[in-house]
């Protein structure tokens, strides 16, 4: 037998053993505990998104909501095509680039360095009244979320407008789940493949 044939037979035997060994190993799967943890993480995310601070700019209709009770915004304010309000009644007409000083009182319009706005008319991302499953699916749907993948959505969570939910100014309830816990839950859910309940 030539040396080349011998080497080929040894290599073939080695590959066969390797394939047989690999076939006996348990496949790597996301077990129920991983999925359960991801779904628990999403529930934390859901609680934040369905808090009034987030829902008020993510209603089902075109009128933003306001207040801790989520009532329809006064002055017949409307979303507008770009989410910044209608001509002559744009969000920034009343909402400045920062929360006003507390001495101004409890009912002064809040502000954000990013500029106040809602999602655009053709990319409504609705948080109000959505079931956990529907909310989860919609968040990941680029037709509704501004064309963002999970990494871009995570970046969005660091914008001044989103951060505002944890420091909404005098007379407004902040998001009840600490921001660090929310971000950790988002990241755990995303790492697990963002499963939906």
What are these regions (language model features)?
Residues 3-40, 52-55, 60-65, 184-197:
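Post-cleavage N-terminal segment of exported redox proteins
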Residues 28-48, 64, 68-83:
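Electrostatic cytochrome c docking/interface patches
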Residues 43, 52, 105-197:
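C-type cytochrome heme-c attachment and multiheme electron-transfer modules
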Residues 48, 85-88, 130:
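Processing junctions and N-termini across compartments
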Residues 52-61, 88-99:
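The canonical Cys-X-X-Cys-His
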Residues 58, 71-75, 81, 95, ...:
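Histidine-centered active-site/metal-ligand motif
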Residues 59, 66-70, 103-107:
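Short, solvent-exposed loop/turn and secondary-structure capping segments
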Residues 98-101, 115:
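A short acidic, glycine/proline-enriched capping/turn motif at secondary-structure boundaries
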């Amino acid at each position: 037998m030539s040396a080349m044939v011998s080497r080929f037979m040894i290599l073939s035997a080695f590959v066969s053993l390797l394939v047989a060994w690999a076939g006996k190993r348990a496949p790597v799967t996301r077990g129920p505990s991983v999925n359960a943890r991801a779904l628990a993480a999403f529930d934390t995310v859901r609680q934040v998104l369905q808090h009034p601070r987030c829902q008020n700019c993510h209603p089902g209709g075109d009128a933003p909501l306001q207040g801790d009770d989520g009532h329809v915004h006064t002055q017949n304010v409307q979303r507008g095509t770009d989410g910044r309000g209608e001509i002559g009644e744009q969000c920034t007409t009343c909402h400045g680039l920062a929360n006003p000083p507390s001495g101004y009182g409890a009912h002064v319009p809040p502000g954000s360095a990013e500029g106040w706005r809602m999602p655009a008319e053709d990319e409504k991302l609705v948080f109000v009244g959505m079931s956990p499953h529907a909310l989860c699916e919609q968040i990941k749907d680029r037709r509704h979320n501004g064309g963002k993948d999970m990494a871009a959505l995570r970046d969005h969570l660091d914008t001044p407008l989103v951060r505002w939910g944890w420091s909404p100014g005098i007379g407004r309830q902040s998001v009840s789940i600490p921001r660090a816990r929310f971000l950790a839950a988002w990241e755990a859910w995303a790492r697990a493949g963002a499963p939906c309940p």
